[in-house]
Amino acid sequence: MDAQKMKMVIGLVLVATTAFALMIPAASAVDDFITRRAYDNLVKSGAIKDIPVMAKTIISNPVLEEGMLTYYTNKKLGDSAISCGETCFKFKCYTPRCSCSYPVCK
């Protein structure tokens, strides 16, 4: 195999490896979200300052919010009501008076 073809093969392998490596985190990511109502409660209570970096996705569309809450209710917790409107990805709830019942705060 000449040098030009060898460089092309190595380049293709590097591109494929990089593309695969970039897809793994996206495929294994867990959505960590908070509803607009829960976020507003955090701001009003002053507890927002206790969160070092807001890494949650704020859901402000009522239809999308209801869909996410329904998904988590049906998939993980049966027919439980979700009162806090926040997921607890790292087993911590920021909304006051809520505790983690993975994957959502109650």
UniProtKB/Swiss-Prot annotation:
Propeptide: 30-79
InterPro entries: Cyclotide, Cyclotide_sf
GO BP terms: defense response; killing of cells of another organism
Post-translational modifications: Violacin-A is not a cyclic peptide.
Keyword match Signal: yes
Disulfide bond among keywords: yes
UniProt keyword terms in alphabetical order: Cytolysis, Disulfide bond, Hemolysis, Knottin, Plant defense, Signal
Top-rank lineage group of the source organism: Eukaryota
Disulfide-bond pairs as recorded: 84-98, 88-100, 93-105
Family membership: Belongs to the cyclotide family. Moebius subfamily.
Domain notes: The presence of a 'disulfide through disulfide knot' structurally defines this protein as a knottin.
Function text: Probably participates in a plant defense mechanism. Has low hemolytic activity.
Name of the protein described by the UniProt record: Violacin-A
Organism: Viola odorata (Sweet violet)
